[in-house]
Each structure stands twice: as C-alpha cells, then as structure tokens.
A protein has these predicted regions:
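Secretory targeting signatures
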Residues: 1-29
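Cellulosome-associated attachment modules in secreted, modular CAZymes
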Residues: 18-106
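Sec-exported extracytoplasmic/periplasmic mature domains
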Residues: 63-70, 96-100, 141-142, 186-190, ...
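Extracytoplasmic substrate-binding proteins
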Residues: 103-107, 201-285, 374-444
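Short helix-initiation/N-cap motifs at beta->coil->alpha
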Residues: 111-113, 167-181, 315-325
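A short, structured surface patch at a secondary-structure boundary
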Residues: 124, 128-187, 192-198, 311
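Structural recognition of the beta-strand scaffold that forms the well-ordered cores
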Residues: 125-129, 138, 145-150, 191-196, ...
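Alpha-helical, coiled-coil/dimerization segments enriched in small aliphatic residues
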Residues: 154, 287-319
C-alpha cells in the first residue's frame, strides 16, 4: 500500500450573485446553489460551507436570494446576522464582518451545539478556563495574548505550556459555582475567555454589560455532536480570532492524515476495537465509545480514523461501564486500547508508563486481545486532543507494522509537535522519551 501521508486536496467553489428576501424552506432544488465545502467552519455567514469566510459567501447569499428560497438545512449559515431569515441585510452584515473595521457580532456554533457570538474583531487579552484554551492559543498563534487562567491552568506542566505558572490566577471555576471566577475575570482586563464555558456564565457575563467574549470550543472531541470535532473547533475558533490562515494550516494537516488513514479503511473485514478509559479497578471497565448523537470522546474520535470499527454500540453518554469478566467474554474485541488519563506528564520516563500499561493489561487476561498480544495504550492528553492525528500513525504502526511505517509515524508526530505546540524537542530521540505523549504496546502476553 502507498504509505505517503500527504495528498493534494482541491476545493472547487461555485458562486453566483443576486439580491432579494427569502425565508427558510425544505427545498432541495437540483438547480439551486451547490454546497461546495467541508461544512466544518461553524460560523454564521459561511454560506457556502467551505473553510473560509469571504466574498464567495456574499455571492452565495445573493444567489440564494435570487433563487427566492432558502434551504436552511442545506445552507444553515447563510443567515449571517442570525435573525432567522435570509435577506439583503445578511449581505450587508457579512460585508461588515469581512471589512473588520467596526465591531460586529459574529455568531458561531459552540460546544453542546449551542449558538454563541463574539464581537468581531477582538484583539484583546485572553483568559482560559481549561487546557483547551492554551492548546487553541498555540495552534492559532495567539498564545502570547493569554495572560490569565483558572487556578488549575496555572498548575499545568510548563514543558507543554510555557509561562502557565505566571498566568494571573482567576481562582477556581465550576459550572455551578463561578461567581468569584467571574468577578476576577472582569477585573483581569481580558476581553476573551476560551475553554469550557457554562451557558449560565455566558449569559451572566452578557447581562453584566462587561465586554468579554466567550469562545466555547474544545481542542478535544469530547462532544456528543458529530459536527463539533477537533478540526471544526480549531477552524471555527481561528476565524473568530481573525486567525483563519493558521487554523487552515492545521486543517490541511488533518486532511492529509485523514486521507492517509481512510485509504486503509477500504477493506470490509475491519478489526474491532474497544477503548478502556483509564482502567484502575480490575473488576469494572469504563469504555469510551460513540454517542448515539454521532459525536465521541476525543480518544474514540481519533482512534476511529484507523481501519477499525468500534465493537461497542453508541451510548447516550458516550461511555459504558461493564464488568471486566463480561467485557472479556462478550465484547471481546480484536484490539483493546487502554486510554490512560493523568498517568504521566509529557516528559515522564517511558519505562515508568510502560509499567502502568502492563499492570492494567493484566485486567484483560481472559480476553482474546490479551492472549494475542493486541493490547495497546495511549495517553488521552495527546491522542484525545488535537495532537491525536499527529500521533495516530505511531499507533497504526504498532498494530499493523506491515501497513504503517514506524519511522514515518515518528517523523510525522515530531513535525506536528514542532509546528503546532510549544514543546521544545531537539530530535525524534527526544520525542521518544516523552512518556506522556507516545503510544505503547503491552509486553506481558504469554
């Protein structure tokens, strides 16, 4: 098989022009505007659903107006001003956003499939509630604007997040207890807060009149909805921050990796897998899986790009708790992936993590995967986040050494970390010593 990671991807944009007022319909007219894009830029105004907010969207809205009907299901973001109808006002509104000279509400779909807005453009300082905000900052090139964070954020490992210990401490943040956090945030001078934002905090800040925008997006696919993926979140966040080009660099990498993995998904006899999330009790296993609504936890989202299928049916909560004996007997996937959480810092010695992997692999001794040596382990903090696609070639090479090139996997992950993170690694050999980032194979099978 071709092991090339990179392919050229072409996007053709079809545009047209016009101008009238239309309401939503369920029309699916073959002669109407053509949906041309990826559908992952979840910003209102992105009428043609590609990865850009630009003049082609203006033309698409004009074309919809000329057609006289708006298929809201097919073109949800044609409603640039988010008022429920598509009119010539949306054309003017989008032009104002593109001009970027006057602060204008830019609406987007955030985590939980909820619509929020930011005042665009916003070039002020940024506060973060969780590490997702720090991740976004590094990918998009706005890390130097992050000056404040929760108490938790100030304690993150400074290898991955340089200067985290020097952030202004905004205190503890909980979705049900955010009063002190909100007060500290309002005093911080930050005009943006990124990470997980409880809807109640979002509403409270808006009601306060304080000009603080909230970007409720994640660098991990911990969402029950299929459209809020790692890629769509980074792209959407990039456009909200005026850093679309940086976001599209990540998208280009993700596209190349997804094409690479998809090429190996062609066979019908796919291996089955199950993800055992941070197993610590030999008697009971928590298994991450897909949500019934299409989304997935970050580890499952990433691993699903490999030529495997989830052995466990989708669940309303994205996770199922199961007796270990029952798991080994009745689920019994071809491959078990142990998803470690909090087991290691980025630069923990790999041999220390391997001991943890081998200890927890013992829980599955009666499974076919254990007997055949097909238990592997990942660190959720890398595989379950935006770094996952960068590291996934390594996991593929462990599972199928004849199909995936291990050296290429190391090189790809190393290049990824150099481009999209602030980790200081001088060589691939340095990366191999990052026990909290890399992947593992059990070493205890008979």
């Amino acid at each position: 098989m071709d092991k090339k990671l990179f392919a050229i991807i072409a996007v053709v944009i079809v545009v047209a022009a016009a101008c009238v007022v239309v309401f939503a319909t369920g029309s699916n007219d073959d002669d109407g505007p053509v949906l041309t894009g990826s559908g992952r830029l979840l910003v209102y105004g992105n009428a043609d659903n590609n990865d850009y907010l630009d003049e082609s969207d203006v033309k698409m809205i004009q074309n919809i107006l000329e057609e006289g009907s708006w298929d809201k299901e097919k073109y949800p973001f044609a409603d640039a001003n988010h008022d429920g109808v598509v009119t010539s006002e949306d054309v003017d509104y989008l032009k104002k956003l593109l001009d970027g000279k006057e602060k204008t509400r830019m609406w987007y779909v955030g985590s939980g499939k909820t619509d929020y807005y930011v005042n665009y453009p916003n070039t002020g300082n940024i506060a973060v509630t969780v590490d997702y905000g720090l991740m976004m900052g590094q990918v998009l090139g706005v890390y130097d604007r992050i000056v404040a964070g929760t108490d938790k954020c100030t304690k993150y490992n400074t290898d991955r997040y340089p200067g985290a210990d020097k952030l202004t401490n905004l205190g503890t943040y909980k979705s049900s207890d955010y009063v002190d956090f909100q007060e500290n945030l309002m005093k911080s001078g930050c005009t943006i807060v990124m990470g997980y934002i409880a809807p109640a905090l979002y509403d409270s800040l808006r009601e306060s009149g304080k000009d603080i925008d909230q970007i409720n997006l994640s660098c991990s696919a911990q969402t029950k909805y299929a459209d809020n993926t790692v890629v769509s979140s980074i792209l959407t966040c990039g456009v909200l921050l005026g850093k679309g080009d940086a976001a599209r660099e990540y998208c280009a990498f993700a596209d190349k990796m997804e094409d690479y993995f998809a090429d190996k998904m062609a066979g019908s006899n796919l291996s089955t897998f199950a993800v055992a999330y941070d197993p610590r009790d030999p008697a009971v296993i928590n298994c991450d899986t897909h949500y019934t609504t299409g989304g997935a936890f970050g580890d499952v989202w990433t691993i699903s790009h490999l030529p495997m299928k989830d052995k466990i049916d989708p669940q309303p909560t994205g996770m199922v708790k199961i007796d270990t004996e029952e798991f080994c007997k009745n689920v019994d996937p071809d491959i078990i992936i142990i998803s470690l959480w909090g087991a290691a810092a980025d630069k923990t010695a790999p041999e220390d993590v391997q001991k943890i992997v081998d200890e927890r692999a013992q829980y599955f001794q009666t499974s076919r995967a254990y007997k055949e040596g097909n238990i592997y382990a990942v660190n959720y903090e890398s595989i379950g986040t935006y770094m996952g696609l960068g590291a996934l070639g390594l996991l593929g090479a462990y599972i199928w050494p004849d199909e995936y090139d291990i050296d290429e996997g190391w090189q790809t992950f190393y290049d990824f970390l150099g481009k999209f993170t602030y980790l200081k690694l001088d060589s691939i050999e340095d990366l191999k010593q990052c026990g909290g980032l890399i992947v593992y194979k059990m070493t205890t099978a008979n």
